Amino acid sequence: MGYKPKYAASSRKREPDVIRTKPEPEKKPSRPKKAQSKAGRIFQIILTVILVPVCTFASVRLLGWMLETVGRPKAAPVAKIKNMGALDDFDAYVEQAMSQADSGLKVSHLGLTEQTEPTQEETEPVRQHYTIPADALVAPKPNPSCYGQVVSPAEMEPILKNAKWILDGQKTYFQTNQQIYEDSFIRYYLDDSIFAVTWQEVHDDSVYTFSEIKVEDASQFRRHLADGQYGSDTQYLTTEMAETVNAVVASAGDFYRFRNFGAVVYQGEARRVEGTYAETCYIDRNGDMHFTRGGEVLTTQAVQDYVDEHDINFSLAFGPILVDNYELVEHTWYGVGEITEGYARAALCQMDSLHYIVVTANTTGPHQSIPTVAQFAKNIAATGCRMAYCLDGGQTASIVMNNDLVNRPVYGQQRKISDIIYFATAVPEGGTDNG
């Protein structure tokens, strides 16, 4: 028997070796590179052109100083750097370079080339404050170029932007998405002392004409009596009186000569008191509205005391009160104005300081309804006004802008009346075109 090695190969065929390779790691999807902004690219250039030489210069200076100190005995004091002026120059250079880098970054961010950030004086020019003298019988003439007219509320956006300084942070009821009466126009006026915009809306199938006004000075909110004096029996159209006194916007007043009703105050003097149930509106010399209710002031002296206490300029005697301190006022009875019946209406509203709306409600075109006082008050309160008061309605209810009648009075024509309220420019003849 032959010798067989202990580890002799088996007769079983050997399977070929399998070459195993490590699985390739799964590659995560790379994130797309974020596009670098213009400011970022400029900042990189600034780093390369300015900061790299600065750092190189600093490194060389530091290396030179280290070489000077090599081999110096430990106990030896470190010598004072001889040329301190060079380091001062270096510090100044670095400070200047950093300042230039910061300025360059600001310029690139603003998309400017040679301009720096505008100063407050450049963006908000100082404006002169105008006032109408107390003894002036008429106001300055408006500048014709300051009037304008558009069809779409959106077209008023640049006008509202230019009026921001005179609005002084106050919001307007008029908005660029306002729903206006079909086929109507939006009229406006803007100069250095007054902004006014007039338009029409439809509410409860009545056409409401709004004129929103913001003035710079209380002297621009005025009352005019026919012939410029108390007690005149002469009567004029609203458009005629508005043109006489150079009104930007005017509204019929309380028709004081037609009714012996309420307290009449003109030029700070109590003239007449009649009708114990009357609610009276007073305008003080700051341009703010005040109210008295029926029975609160019953004599001329009592009215004069009220005038002196509140520094009242003039009054309006019709009513009733619609909104008092943002609260809707309800009435079940009032002596004038047929409050529970449909009637053409007019009102004066105060939105904020030196900020007003005059409004009428009439029938126009297919819209042939006219409101009760309750309906009228509801729509007036929706403007967000602080105070609101009914003026004489019916055929008297009229609003005039640029000497043109804007609304459609009863029977389609104005009535001759004895007084108006109006808003005027205070800029001396000619005004300033800010439109």
Task: List each language-model region with its residue ranges.
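Beta-strand-turn-beta hairpins that frame and shape the catalytic cleft
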Residues: 206, 218, 288, 350-357
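Conserved, well-ordered active-site substructure
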Residues: 261-283, 331-386, 390-391, 396-435
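Zymogen propeptides
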Residues: 2-3, 15-275, 279-280
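Short, solvent-exposed aromatic-acidic interface loops
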Residues: 226-231, 296-298, 361-365
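A short, polar/proline- and glycine-enriched secondary-structure boundary/capping micro-motif
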Residues: 232-235, 299-306, 367-374
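Proline-rich, Ser/Thr-phosphoregulated intrinsically disordered regulatory regions in large mammalian
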Residues: 3, 8-10
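Active-site-adjacent helix-turn-beta-strand microarchitecture at beta-sheet edges
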Residues: 251-333
